Structure formats: structure tokens, C-alpha cells
Amino acid sequence: MHKLIIKYNKQLKMLNLRDGKTYTISEDERADITLKSLGEVIHLEQNNQGTWQANHTSINKVLVRKGDLDDITLQLYTEADYASFAYPSIQDTMTIGPNAYDDMVIQSLMNAIIIKDFQSIQESQYVRIVHDKNTDVYINYELQEQLTNKAYIGDHIYVEGIWLEVQADGLNVLSQNTVASSLIRLTQEMPHAQADDYNTYHRSPRIIHREPTDDIKIERPPQPIQKNNTVIWRSIIPPLVMIALTVVIFLVRPIGIYILMMIGMSTVTIVFGITTYFSEKKKYNKDVEKREKDYKAYLDNKSKEINKAIKAQRFSLNYHYPTVAEIKDIVETKAPRIYEKTSHHHDFLHYKLGIANVEKSFKLDYQEEEFNQRRDELFDDAKELYEFYTDVEQAPLINDLNHGPIAYIGARHLILEELEKMLIQLSTFHSYHDLEFLFVTREDEVETLKWARWLPHMTLRGQNIRGFVYNQRTRDQILTSIYSMIKERIQAVRERSRSNEQIIFTPQLVFVITDMSLIIDHVILEYVNQDLSEYGISLIFVEDVIESLPEHVDTIIDIKSRTEGELITKEKELVQLKFTPENIDNVDKEYIARRLANLIHVEHLKNAIPDSITFLEMYNVKEVDQLDVVNRWRQNETYKTMAVPLGVRGKDDILSLNLHEKAHGPHGLVAGTTGSGKSEIIQSYILSLAINFHPHEVAFLLIDYKGGGMANLFKDLVHLVGTITNLDGDEAMRALTSIKAELRKRQRLFGEHDVNHINQYHKLFKEGIATEPMPHLFIISDEFAELKSEQPDFMKELVSTARIGRSLGIHLILATQKPSGVVDDQIWSNSKFKLALKVQDRQDSNEILKTPDAADITLPGRAYLQVGNNEIYELFQSAWSGATYDIEGDKLEVEDKTIYMINDYGQLQAINKDLSGLEDEETKENQTELEAVIDHIESITTRLEIEEVKRPWLPPLPENVYQEDLVETDFRKLWSDDAKEVELTLGLKDVPEEQYQGPMVLQLKKAGHIALIGSPGYGRTTFLHNIIFDVARHHRPDQAHMYLFDFGTNGLMPVTDIPHVADYFTVDQEDKIAKAIRIFNDEIDRRKKILSQYRVTSISEYRKLTGETIPHVFILIDNFDAVKDSPFQEVFENMMIKMTREGLALDMQVTLTASRANAMKTPMYINMKTRIAMFLYDKSEVSNVVGQQKFAVKDVVGRALLSSDDNVSFHIGQPFKHDETKSYNDQINDEVSAMTEFYKGETPNDIPMMPDEIKYEDYRESLNLPDIVANGALPIGLDYEGVTLQKIKLTEPAMISSENPREIAHIAEIMMKEIDILNEKYAICIADSSGEFKAYRHQVANFAEEREDIKAIHQLMIEDLKQREMDGPFEKDSLYIINDFKTFIDCTYIPEDDVKKLITKGPELGLNILFVGIHKELIDAYDKQIDVARKMINQFSIGIRISDQQFFKFRFIQREPVIKENEAYMVANQAYQKIRWFK
């Protein structure tokens, strides 16, 4: 390794150079080294000789370059420049300088620097650096302004080209000049990065010093020696009395010898009595002395035995509960005792409170004498010994966190110190895998516990955050997750309680609450107020006084002072045991925490079975070409064996799965919970089979109920013959139908070749006798539990089919996450092999393996293979095919140069920009091994031109089908002069029974009229679009006429410009529809006459007979439901009944859509020969449309079911493919324009309809209105029926009426449009009592509006008539306009005869008269003159509904609409027609 020091403009940087890498130095933040104001970019790289260069200039120790502000100095250090020296052992000051007397002599230095205070570095962690003002000193690459600075252990110092690193035992030095020193050299090698496992820690076997537990019994003293209580006089007096009596007898009666005998005997008796007394007394005293001596010796031995036991107990306690200072040594030396306690140990979660007189671990048994009248000192001695060893004095007092909540009371700062001791003890002896801490504390107390952040136990790994809750944010961030964790543990205990199994939860959570206010309003309070020990959670409460503690606290510790504490209760029992807390003032708590933070605890040694193995590693290859797939296909034969590698039992120990019927197969189960590698093991097995067997020998049908994830991975694999995803009821039955069709096909082929097993067939195929490949078909369901739940009938049939298909080469592999309740007897009995990965619980493991082993698996991909009844039962690691495939064998290494800060929550927070430079490079996307192998197999398949196997399972109908994919759509190629029979290509049909998908074609002659029933939004309009364009593309506009009735949402409007379309109707165009009905009736009658005339039965026969072109008529109705309750319902339905009954022979065909079958009347519905059902919300409605169906209609837009013997399912075609550059309407317009431009013949006539607005000026020139006026008529508007010009003949009398004067004024305006022409032809006289013609008073010959003037007009009219009768017609005719006829009569009292003469004779003589008036006034008047005029006039314009007028008696019109503005009825010859006046 090389180190490079870069110095520029008082900036100092160091770079560790790695061989083969390149580096940049610039002022850009993304560079490897950033130097402000550098002004250039320096590239560092090695040349072919390994020499480091800066911009192609070699760095030979020192390279100086000119910079913008200062010289750029590059200093390169190598291994040869490294040295390490110990501090002086006696003095506390050393010097580094150029002088011979310096402790470390470096000639290149200009001035010396002083290093001091290194003797106390172990405690202080730093030394002091002293230098003069002329020397630049950098500490951690920052220039120091002070002359005395602290440098901590690990800090780097740079002085005049010399690099120093402060260590606890000395200095590491990098100098390109010789370093001379008498100091002890520590090492000659430059320290490199430590090995990967330098900080890994493995538990050593634990040494446990048990506390003595054998009972020690103090026996009672032996029974006291019984003292002879006989007094000496009792022995002496009887013989003395005898002597006395003998003497008396002798005195009374001397008897010589007898007396001597009696006296002798008595004397002897006295002597022996005295002797016996004193000997017995002596013996008693000796026995008493011996008893006391022996028992005291016994007590002395017992005392030693007890003392030894107490010492053993004290040693055990002191060993297992050392002082914090001793713990520091344990941690510092990385002693094997670290993390020695596990949840299975007796002292798990035990810690020391302090020093106290503790209870003995053994029982001292002594039975005190209950009652004794005489005091025995030996009993007192025994009792004294028993009472002396009541406690073990000055021994560690132990508390534990296993038996309910505990609480500390007292001064908070004292309690925090006790909690710190507890933290240190528990953290040192318990692994962070087994124990975690959570502190809920006040924010001002966090600083006190800040040192503990280094403890790995303070990180809650499940939440990836430090276990400190001290404000609202941390509370919400942590406690909610903890609440969920507690809830899950409680639920787990409840579930396991049924089986009486104990659960040990890991990690144990020590939940310390020093501030209840933070959780008082949180849901976790529910659990804090109960004992959570059973769930692996230890609660510790901190309060000032005992009264504030929760009631469920079991152990209470009172910290009275730094030297006194009291264990008040323990596990709810009063103990009141005082203890002395340990003093830890001189212990560096953070040092202990930091040392523990460096340890990576590895719980278990690595198993012989690898934790993971990639697919290619299992095959011992690096590149897919090395798999030798072609040779494997050539050599492997399925009828011999189907064994393929699946994983490894250990190094180079391959485990193979062989689904040959006589080995592990043919069917099996796979179980594994989420994340266990279940899908991956299936993928590896599929891939392994594909590598080893030819596509004609092995094929896969995947059922991926979760949504097609696995199916997508293998979509390019030639062995894949089908995928079944997201099955609903219909798709399930369709799939089953397809599989059964495949079985029938295989049975047929077996019969043709006289074999009964697939192995025999494969032999014939290899020999070339059989020509159609028939591979083993592996049906694999990735999540059959859900499939079985949703589609139980399908699952049952699938298992049954697989059982039947054993000899036909059908293999069924079922995979599930949770086998419990899913694997029934039928599935179990048909599954010879079982693969069990990690499952959720023991019940699941027992369900699939009949053992609980799989519940203990922890690694993804680790699995058990069980075949039969434990014929094979092996644990192995399955291969992983999702690994990145790098053909060059080098993993893409991207160095992340982001600098992260560990924030207060223990989480990483980026504090600089991303310096990786990836934003400037194109990210390389590597293939997975699975993708690489599939691509390799695909390339082999293409190269060898392997014929695809016929697929037993055709994919579900696509959601988009296009007409151009089904049939020719270029109208230029299809239009011809020859009349063709109509064929309709409706879409793509699906016939799983025949394993066929193809165009859905209807012969119109056979299909008849078509009714499509479906819910709105499922493609009904698209169905009509498809038919419209299909017809238009195959037939010229003169061969096919289309009438579009759009009763929906204007869906047919975009196609109205197709030249074949005669007209377009909407539901509110009642009049237009009425016209169409009349036209259809006329056309039916016309065609029927043709048939009758030529004596043929159909128009097609007529065409063949005559060669005439009579177009097909297509009536297309969208949303027939709208006909109901419409104003034209009755007439329209009657028309459609007639059309569907008679139209087919007349080449008039109806196609309609509706949302329900009963939208049509029964006679019409019966005539609809072809009925199609789309998706319907009411499922029963489908049966009404197509009858009993095998498959329901899927809830997919465009999916439909055709009524036929087999009820064929199909997907409706679309006229155009989706084009990103054009909208659908643009595509329609383009084709319509092309058709219009291409076709120059006749197109169908549309239905003439009244425009919304007709202005006189718009029609003046086109209809030549001035000439019409000049020829003696008034053009007034257009009629609604034929939209032709309507006029009032001035040569005949006429009457115009309306409902209001405003309409009369409008009529006057239209009548006077050509006033100049009228004046040329007529002498115009107007009697206008109501003033509507007032605007023209000066433009006519005579105008009267006053009563007298009106009378004058009357006289003029009579005189004019008389004069013309006498003289004949004048050169200029007269035109009399009588406005307000009623008032005219009232003013003039014109006789009836005059009225008759004016009407009958006037026109002949050139006197023309026009009556105008308000309809109601004309009707209500009782003037006979009006009645006469009405009866004699044959021209009327009535501005009122026919049903409301009373001039004529016409048949009542049902629901006649209200007359709109400018509308009227023209009545002539007892017939009427509706018109609209010009504007």
C-alpha cells in the first residue's frame, strides 16, 4: 500500500492508493481529493511498471507542481518509509527533531517538536504536542494555530514532510528520510486493513463456577453424660447400722465368730462403697470432658466446611459478577467471557446491585433443642456457629430481570448511575443478539447516557434505530413499533399455549422507563401496566418515591446515596436488604462501550452446508457456454433417469432431484414461507431440467396464481409450453379443459403407436418411428393454497388428472407458503417427494414432513428433501439462479464515496454529495444467471432450428385483438364488382377442447340478425365499429349501405363519414327516426316486389339472376335499451320486428347491442338468430342470452361468448392497432379519407332532415327565391318530411294564422323579403290593424291601420273587384293582405257575399287576397265571414299543433310535440305537413 500526502495553499490531504485504481484531485466536490482554488485537474494512475504518476509525470517520492496560488506538493510514502517506536518508559516528555540529542532524530526537520503526557495516555487518551511558531503542524490534516495542542489516540500529525500517528503504546512514523532513535521499535511493517474477521467474536465454552448448594447439617451435641446421683452416706450408713446392731447384739448376747463375721462384712461394704463412689465420680468427669472436646472439634470442622462453602459462593459471585473495573479489563483484552451468558443459562439477565450481606446459596441445617431444664453449653456453641454463618458477608448482591417489573427509587442522578452499571454488566456478558435496551427518559438526561450509544445493545435492530425515547419524534418512531412487537409476542404465546410449548423470545428487551409522561398517552401504556416477562420484555421503572410506582412492580430498589442502597422487595417479598453500590468514578464507561461496539458477534460457526450457492457454482462453471447444453441434450434420456442437480449437501456434494416414476417422482410438494426461497428453488429446478433435457423431452406448464411473476421469468424458455396466471372460475375450467385435451391427445398418440407409457414413446421418438414430440409435462403451481381456496374444484380435478397422467408423462409439483389445512390426504398420497424450506411454524413442518425440522430453518434456500416414507431425508442448500451473471468473471465494483454521519437516532445520514460519479456514467445492468442461461438455451434453439412443441395450453385470449391480425383489411385489395356473400370476422375465438385459437367468422346468411348483450363499458360499441369496418373494407359503398342508430353515448359518431353510411341517428331525433322507419318500410315493400316480380326467394338470387347491384342494408343499433320509453318505441319496435322477420331474405340485416335481453320484445328477440353475451353484472342474464354455458364471460373489456352448440368464447376485434402517433379518431379519419378518395361511385342517400336554422338569405340564391316570387308565389320555408321549399301561391287565396303577434311580425318579415319584386308585379294594399306590417307602410301602394282607413281598403277592394269584373284583368294584379282578419270584419262589416266573391272570383281577375290573424281569435270569433273564408280557402299556414287547431278535423296525434318558434303546418287539400319558416 502507498500513502500520498497532498499539500496546497495550507490545505493538507492524505490518500491511500490502491493498485490498479485511478484517482482525481481537483476543486470539484466529486473528485477523490478536493482542494479549493486548485485551478486544474490532476489524474493519478499507475503506469505499466506500477509507478504512480500525476498527469503522466512520475512521482518519485516528492513531486512539486505549480498551482494558481501555491505550489502543489505530492509526497509518496511506501512500506520502506514506515517505522513504529514505543514511548520512553521513564520520562513523560520526548522530542522529535534534527538534533542528535532528540529522542527521535530526523535530519530533514528544521525545528523540533515536543510530545508530552504520554505516560497517562491510557487514562486521558491523548498526548500534548508542543511546537514553535515557525513550524506548521497539522493535526488530522488541519493546520493548528495554537502552539500546544492535544492529539488523541488514532490522530494523525504532519510536520514538515513527517507523518505521525498517535497510538496508545507509541508513535507510527512515515518519513522519506532516515529516522534514528534509541527508542524501542514496535514493528517494521506498515499496518494494513485488518482481515475481514478481525473484529468477529465467537463465544467460547463458558466456565461456570457454581455456588455451593449442598446442605450442611450441624448435628446436635451427643446426649449429656448421666451423673450418678447416689450420695456416699447411702453406701456407708447401712453397714454402719449393721455394725452398730451387731455390737448391741453382742452386748446383749455375745456370739463370738458371728459378730466378727458381721463386722468384717460391714467394714468391707463401707470400704467398697466409698471406693466405688469416688471412682464413678472420676469417670463421670472424664466423660464430660471428652464429650465437650469431641463436639467442639466437630463444630470446628463444620465451621471450616461452612467457611469453605461461603468462600466458594463469594468466589462464584465475584467471578460471575465482577466489578466494572474488572469488566473494563475483560473487554479491553477481548476475553472469552464476553457475551458468555445466553437465554438458556441460569443467570441470564442477572446483574450486581452492590456489596451486601447476602443469603447463603446452601442450607445450613441445625435443629435447636426445644426444651431442656438443664443448660448444656454445647448446644449454645452449636447455635452460635449456626447463627454466625447466617449470611455471606460483603458479597455481590444479585438482582435479575426475569421475574417481573423492577423499580428504582431515589435521587435521579444516583439511579442513572446505577442504571449505567447495569448497562455495562448486562452488555458485557450478554450478546446484542440476545439482549437490547430501550430507554424512555427525559431529554435533559440523554447527555448522561450518551456514552451508551456506542453499545450495540442500544440499537433496536428490528427498527434500525437507537433505543432512546426522549421526545415526541422518537416516541412515535419507536414505541409504535415496539407496541406491535409486544402484540405479536403475546399472540404467539396464546397460540403456543395450546401445545404447552414454552417460547423463548429473542432478543430480550430491557425496557427502562425513567419518564412516564412520554408514554402516558401512547397505546403502549396498555402493555406497560402489566408484567411482560413472559414475552421476553423486562420492565424497569424509575421514580422519586415508592408511592409513584405502578402497582405491578415486583422488585423495588431504593438508592439512598452513592454509598448506600436498599433492596426493599424482591419478587413481591419484603427483604429490606441494605447494600453498598459500586463506585465507578474512575472507570471510562465510553471506552468499554466503544470496545464492545467493535465486536461483531458471530453466533454460530459456519456449517458444512454453504449459506448460499449460485446456479452456475453448483454446475462448477463460470460461463453458460461451459454448461455444454447441446451435449447434455444429446446424452440424457428421460426414460433412463430424470435426475438433475438441485443444490448441495456440502462442498462438492451435489444433491439431485429425480422425478422419474421409479425414483423420486412423478409428483411432489414444495413448502416455504415468504422469503424462504420457495420460488427460487422451483426456478432452479426448471432451469436445471431445461439444461439437461431437450425441449422435446421436457416441457413446463406454469400455474402462477400470484400473478405471473415466475411465468414472466421463463417466457423466452423454449421448454415453456404455457402459463396460467390469475385464474378465475372460467380460466380455471379452461385450463383444466386444455390439460384434459392434452391427455386425450397423448392417449391417441399412444394408441397409434401401440404403447402405453411415455418412456416407450420416447424410445420410438428417438428411433424416428414416432414423429410428433411429446415431452414430459411438468405442471407447476407456485401457490396452490390460494388456488385451492379460490378454486377447490379445479384443484381437485388437477390432482386427479395428474394421477391419471402418470404413465402419460404428466408431473405435478405443488408449492405453497403454508401447508397447514391445505395438504389433504389426496394431495399427500399423490406426492412422493417433498421439499420443505423455512416454514412458519412446527405445525406447517409436521404437515409436510411429519417432523418439526423445517420450522428451525433460518437461511433462505435451505431445505429438506424427503422422498417416500423417509426413504431419503436430507438437508441441503438449493442453488440460487438469481445471482448476477458477469461473463468476465469480475463483479462490478462501485466505490461509494458518500460520507455518512451516524445521527442521534443511530441511523446513517449522508453529509456530502454522491461522489461515486455514477451520475456521469451509464449504469450497467447485469443479467441474472437465470436470464443468461435462458438466453443461451434460446440461442441454441435458434441455431439448431428446433421445432416448437405443440402447446397444450394456449395463452388466454389477449385483451387486445386487431382485425388486421385476423383478416385482410386493405379495402383496395378487397373491393370488387362481384357481389360477395357477407362474412363477418368478429374477433379471435378460443376453443380449448380443440387446443385452437383463430378468427371468429360468421356467414351472415347462417348467422342472421345479431344481438350482443353486455354491460356498458365492456366493448359493445367497439363490436359495432369492428363490424362496420369489416363490412366497409370488404364491400364497396354501392354494395353495402349502413344505417347507424346511436342510442348510447355517441360511440358511433366517429364512423359516420364512412362512405357506406347512409345516415346516423340519435335517440332524440324522433322525427328523423320516424322518417327512417317510413323509408325502411318502403324499401322492404320495394324489395318484396322485386322478389315477386322475378319469382326468386332472396335478393342474392336476384343478383345472380339479373346481375343488378342491390346493396346489402345493415341496420346497426347501439344500446337498444334506450328505445324503451322513447317517443318512437312502438313504431320502432314494430319496424324492427318486421325487419328481423322479413329482412334477411331481402339482404337487410340488423345488428344491435343492449344491456339485457328483455330490452327487446319477445318476437324480435326470437328473430335474433345469433346472440352474443359479453360480461354482465347479473350473472344469470348470460344464461338468458346463450343458454347453459360451460364458461362464464370474463370481466374483461371485449370478451364475449357466442351462442352455439359449444358456446364459443372470443375476444372482439378492433378495427385499428394502437398507434402512438395517432389517435383512434385520426386513424378512422385517415381510412375514411382514403376510401372517399379511392371510390368515385354512388354512395347511399341520407335521410333528409330539417336544419336547426334556415335563413332566407342562405337559400335565396340556391333555391332561386326571387324568381319564385316573380312567378306569383311567396317562399316561406322548408317542410320537415322532404326538406323541400314550401310556398304560398298568391294566385290562390290563403290564410296564415299563428299563436302570437310576434310570430305574425316574423311572417310579415318573410313575406316582404322580396318587396321590390312584389311591387313590380302587384299593387299591394295592406290592412294592418295590429301593426305587424307597419314597417312596410311606405313601401306599398296602400296601407291602412286606422279604422277609417281600413274601411277605405274594404271599399277599394270591392271597387277593384267590380272594375276587374267589368273591364277584365288589369295589367297589374292586386295583392290585398288583411292582417287581423277579425278586426277587419269588425271595422268594415264586410258581408259574407263579398268575402265569397273575393275568394272565388278575385284570383281569376288578378285580385289576390291573403288573410293573416291570431289563431285563437279566428277560432273564438262568431263571425260567419271567417267561417266562410276558412271553408273556401285551400292554402293554410297554421302556427299551432294539429291536435290543438280547430280549422280541420284530423286524426289525433299521440304525444304531438309543441310547435317551436318559426314552425307551422301547411294544410292543403285536407292534408298537412310540418314546415319551418325562413328566418
Swiss-Prot record:
The chain crosses the membrane at residues 230-252, 257-279. GO terms for molecular function: ATP binding; DNA binding. Its main location: membrane. It is found in: Cell membrane. ATP binds at residues 672-679, 1014-1021. Belongs to the EssC family. Residues 652-846, 997-1183 form the FtsK domain. Component of the type VII secretion system (Ess). Required for the secretion of substrates including EsxA and EsxB. However, unable to support secretion of the substrate protein EsxC. It comes from Staphylococcus aureus (strain NCTC 8325 / PS 47). NCBIfam families: T7_EssCb_Firm. It comes from the Bacteria. Residues 1-189 are annotated as: Required for substrate secretion, protein missing this segment is unstable. This is Type VII secretion system protein EssC. Homooligomer. Interacts with EsaE. Residues 1-229, 280-1479 are cytoplasmic. It holds the Pfam family FtsK_SpoIIIE. The gene is essC. One of its GO terms (cellular component) is plasma membrane. Residues 253-256 are extracellular. Residues 1249-1479 are annotated as: Required for substrate secretion, truncated protein is stable. Keywords: ATP-binding, Cell membrane, Membrane, Nucleotide-binding, Repeat, Transmembrane, Transmembrane helix, Virulence.
